Regions:
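Short strand-turn segments of transmembrane beta-barrel domains in outer membranes
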Residues: 207-215, 224-259, 278, 575
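Face-selective signature of the C-terminal outer-membrane beta-barrel domain
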Residues: 305-320, 351-507, 586-592, 636
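Transmembrane beta-barrel wall of Gram-negative outer-membrane proteins
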Residues: 245-282, 287-326, 350-370, 424
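Short acidic/polar hinge/loop motifs at secondary-structure boundaries
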Residues: 62, 179-210, 228-229, 300
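Short, acidic, small-residue-rich periplasmic hinge/interaction motif at the N-terminus
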Residues: 29, 33, 41-45, 74-78, ...
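Structural signature of Gram-negative outer-membrane beta-barrels, strongest in the C-terminal barrel
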Residues: 307, 426-431, 435-437, 468-597, ...
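Gram-negative outer-membrane beta-barrel transporters
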Residues: 417-418, 591-596, 612-652
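Extracytoplasmic beta-strand/coil segments of soluble accessory domains associated
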Residues: 136-183
Length: 652
C-alpha cells in the first residue's frame, strides 16, 4: 500500500510539472495575397524542433519550458524571417507572421526530422524555377519521370518511371487538389490520365513520391503518385498572348474577382478570394494533314474563411479539346513514296475529349487543435479517339481504324482526421482517413457505354468489338502514425484497406448480361527517418501497393482471378536513401530502390483482348543534384537507372 501511494504521489508531481509547461501557436500569411501559406518550415533554433504549417497556415509547439525562444520561418520563394517569442508557464503564446516574396535561394531549403514524411525538396525547388507551357510537362519535374506524345497533342501523354511503361497512367496515381485524374477501366486503357484540363499558370505546387509510402495513397500508385496544387488566390489579374509558326497561338487570362473587396477577417488576412481563368490554344502544326488542334479551358475558384479556424474552397472547371493527328508511319511508306515524312497513311485519325469538374474542400481546426478535412468531387468526362496502328493488316479493304469512346460520371469523397499528442519527449501525429470513388459509364445519366469499334474514315462503324456499361466502386479506410521518437529519429507506420466492386454489362450479348467481381486488399507501410544533423537525413521506406485491373478483365474472369488475387495484384517495394546538403547552395538526394510486382492479367484497350503479364522485379538507383551557382543561375542533374526483369520466363 505504501508503495502504491508513493507511486501515485510521483505521478501527481510529474503531472504538475508538465502542467507548468507552455505552448507556442502561430499562423503564417503571404504578404502579396494575404492568404495563409501551407508548408512553411518553422524551427525553434537551438532545440532542433521543427514543424510545418497546415492548410490554414497554422503551426503549434507544445510542452515548452518557460523561456524566450528564437523562431525561424522559411519557405521557397519567400524571405526567411526570424522572430523572438516569450513562452510563459500554463499559457499559449500566439504569433502572426507575414512572409514577403523573394528570389529562390537554395539556402532557404531545410532538412528537418519534423517534416521527414513529406519532404520533397527537389520538386518544390523546380516548380519555382522552370518555365511551364503545358500542364503535362509539369510531370517532368518528378526526377526520373519522362513523357512522350504520339497522337497530336490532344491525347494524354505516354508516361515512363522506374522501369515502368506506365502507358497513360496505369501505375502512377495523378490528382489535382486531391481530385483524381486517372480513369479506371477507361476505353483506351486502365488508369488513363489526361492532365490537359489544368491551366499551367494556375499550378502553385507539386507534391510527389515514388511508390505509395503514404497510407493515404492507394490504387494505381504502384510506381508513384503526383498531386498538383492550384493557386488559392491570384496576386493580380493577368493576360498572356503567344504566337508562332504553323498557325500556332495561345491566349491565357486570369481575373481576380474580389481583389481588395475580399474583406478582412483580421489584420493581414483576407476573408475570401475568388478568381476566374481561361486558356485557349490552336495550331495546325507542321504535318501535311493540318491538325486543327483546339483546346479550351475555363476554371473558377473560391476560397473563404468561415471563422478563424475553418476554410472552404470551391473549384469548378470545364475543358474541351479536338484534333487530327498524323499517326505512326512505317519507313517503307516514305521510301516507296506512298507518303512524305510529315504525311500520314490514315488522315482521318484524331479525337475529341472533354471534362467538367466540381471540387469542394472543407478544412477545420477543432478547439483541441485537431485537423479535419472533408472533400467531395464530381466529374463528367467524355472521350472519343480514332486510331489506326496497323493500317491494313486486319482488314485489307476497309483498313484497321478503331474508335475508342466513352462518357462517364465519377464522384467521390476524401476525408481525414489528424490529431497530435506528446508523451514526454515523443511526439505523435495520428491520421485516420476514409475514401470513396465510383465511376459509371452508360446508364440513364447522360453517360454513354464504353466502346471499342472498327470504323472507316470516322464516319462508318464496321464492327463493335467491345460495348458495355461499367460501374466500379473503390472504398478505402486507412490509418497512419508518425512518431518523432527524438529530435533525430522518426518512425512512420500505416495500413490501408481497399475494397473494390467491378461491374460490367455486356451490351453485345442478347439479352445484355451483367457480371460483378469483388476483392479487398490490405496494404501496410513502414518508413524510418534519421536526421544526423541539419545537413544529412537518412531514410528507409517500405510498403505494399497495387493497381486495380480493368473491369472488362476481372468480371469475365471473375472467380479464377479472385482466388489467385490477380484482381488486385500486389506490388512490394522499398527505398533506401539520403538527403544531403553539404553546402548552403547544394542539395543532393540519392536512393537505391527495389520493387516486386505480382502476376496480373492486362486488358489491351486497342485490341479488346486480355494478355497475361507475369511476375516482375525492378531495381535501380536515383540521383538528383541541385546547385545554385549565382543568385540567378542554377544547375540541376537527374540520373536514374532501372533494371526491370520478368520473373519465371525462359531467357530468350
Amino acid at each position: 500500500m505504501k508503495n502504491f501511494l508513493f507511486f501515485l504521489a510521483c505521478c501527481l508531481l510529474s503531472t504538475g510539472a508538465f502542467a507548468h509547461l507552455g505552448n507556442l501557436a502561430g499562423t503564417v500569411y503571404d504578404q502579396t495575397t494575404n492568404q495563409p501559406i501551407r508548408g512553411v518550415t518553422v524551427q525553434i533554433t537551438g532545440l532542433n524542433r521543427a514543424t510545418t504549417t497546415n492548410e490554414l497556415g497554422q503551426y503549434r509547439f507544445v510542452g515548452l519550458v518557460a523561456a524566450p525562444y528564437k523562431i525561424e520561418l522559411s519557405h521557397l520563394g519567400f524571405a526567411t524571417q526570424l522572430i523572438n517569442v516569450i513562452v510563459q508557464d500554463d499559457q499559449t503564446a500566439t504569433v502572426r507572421t507575414v512572409l514577403t516574396t523573394a528570389p529562390v535561394e537554395l539556402g532557404e531549403v531545410t532538412i528537418s526530422s519534423g517534416r521527414a514524411h513529406d519532404q520533397q525538396l527537389i520538386s518544390n525547388l523546380d516548380i519555382k524555377l522552370r518555365p511551364i507551357t503545358n500542364s503535362q510537362e509539369v510531370l517532368r519535374l518528378v526526377p526520373g519521370l519522362f513523357i512522350g506524345q504520339h497522337a497530336g497533342g490532344g491525347k494524354a501523354e505516354q508516361l515512363f518511371l522506374r522501369g515502368f511503361d506506365l502507358d497513360h497512367g496505369t501505375d502512377i496515381q495523378l490528382t489535382v487538389d486531391g481530385m483524381p485524374i486517372n480513369m479506371v477501366s477507361h476505353a483506351h486503357g486502365q488508369g488513363y490520365a489526361d492532365l490537359h484540363f489544368v491551366i499551367p499558370e494556375l499550378i502553385e505546387g507539386v507534391d510527389f513520391k515514388k511508390r505509395p509510402y503514404n497510407a493515404e495513397k492507394g490504387n494505381l500508385a504502384t510506381a508513384g503518385w503526383v498531386n498538383f496544387r492550384t493557386r488559392t488566390a491570384l496576386d493580380r489579374s493577368f493576360v498572356k498572348l503567344e504566337g508562332g509558326q504553323f498557325d500556332t497561338f495561345q491566349a491565357v487570362a486570369g481575373l481576380d474577382l474580389l481583389g481588395e473587396k475580399g474583406g478582412t477577417a483580421s489584420r493581414n488576412r483576407k476573408n475570401q478570394s475568388a478568381y476566374l481563368a481561361s486558356e485557349y490554344s490552336f495550331t495546325n502544326s507542321y504535318f501535311d494533314n493540318p491538325q486543327h488542334f483546339n483546346r479550351l479551358n475555363v476554371m473558377g475558384k473560391y476560397h473563404g474563411h468561415i471563422g478563424a479556424n475553418t476554410n472552404l474552397t470551391l473549384t469548378g472547371s470545364t475543358f474541351w479539346s479536338k484534333w487530327n493527328h498524323s499517326g505512326q508511319i512505317p519507313d517503307r511508306a516514305i521510301e516507296s513514296g506512298l507518303t512524305g515524312f510529315f504525311g500520314s497513311v490514315d488522315p482521318t485519325e484524331g479525337g475529341e475529349t472533354s471534362r467538367t469538374n466540381f471540387n469542394a474542400q472543407f478544412v477545420t481546426v477543432t478547439p483541441r487543435n485537431n485537423l479535419i478535412k472533408n472533400q467531395v468531387f464530381y466529374g463528367n468526362y467524355g472521350f472519343e479517339l480514332y486510331s489506326n496502328f496497323t493500317f491494313f493488316l486486319r482488314d485489307s479493304i476497309n483498313g484497321d481504324q478503331i474508335r475508342q469512346k466513352e462518357r462517364r460520371n465519377l464522384f467521390g469523397y476524401n476525408g481525414s482526421y489528424i490529431t497530435e499528442s506528446t508523451i514526454g519527449k515523443t511526439h505523435f501525429t495520428t491520421t485516420l482517413g476514409a475514401q470513396y470513388r465510383q465511376d459509371i459509364t452508360g446508364g440513364k445519366n447522360g453517360a454513354t457505354p464504353t466502346e471499342l469499334s472498327y470504323t472507316r474514315n470516322r464516319t462508318e462503324t464496321l464492327e463493335r468489338a467491345k460495348y458495355g456499361n461499367i460501374n466500379e466502386i473503390n472504398a478505402a479506410l486507412y490509418a497512419d502514425e508518425l512518431v518523432e521518437l527524438s529530435d533525430r529519429f522518426t518512425v512512420n507506420a500505416g495500413v490501408r484497406v481497399d475494397y473494390f466492386r467491378s461491374q460490367y454489362t455486356d451490351l453485345l450479348l442478347q439479352p445484355a448480361q451483367t457480371g460483378r467481381a469483388r476483392q479487398a486488399i490490405v496494404s501496410p507501410k513502414l518508413n524510418l527517418y534519421y536526421t544526423l544533423n541539419p545537413r544529412v537525413q537518412l531514410y528507409l521506406n517500405t510498403c505494399k501497393g497495387f493497381h486495380s485491373n480493368d473491369a472488362r478483365v476481372v468480371v469475365p474472369q471473375g472467380e479464377p482471378l479472385r482466388r489467385t488475387r490477380e484482381i488486385l495484384p500486389g506490388a512490394y517495394g522499398s527505398d533506401l536513401g539520403v538527403i544531403f546538403k553539404p553546402f548552403p547552395r547544394l542539395i543532393v538526394n540519392a536512393a537505391a530502390w527495389y520493387l516486386w510486382l505480382a502476376q496480373e492479367f492486362v486488358y489491351v484497350g486497342d485490341e479488346g483482348v486480355v494478355e497475361l503479364s507475369g511476375k516482375s522485379r525492378r531495381e535501380g538507383v536515383d540521383l538528383s543534384v541541385r546547385y545554385q551557382l549565382t543568385k540567378t543561375l542554377y544547375f540541376d542533374l537527374d540520373l536514374n537507372t532501372a533494371n526491370p526483369r520478368s520473373i519465371g520466363d525462359k531467357i530468350g
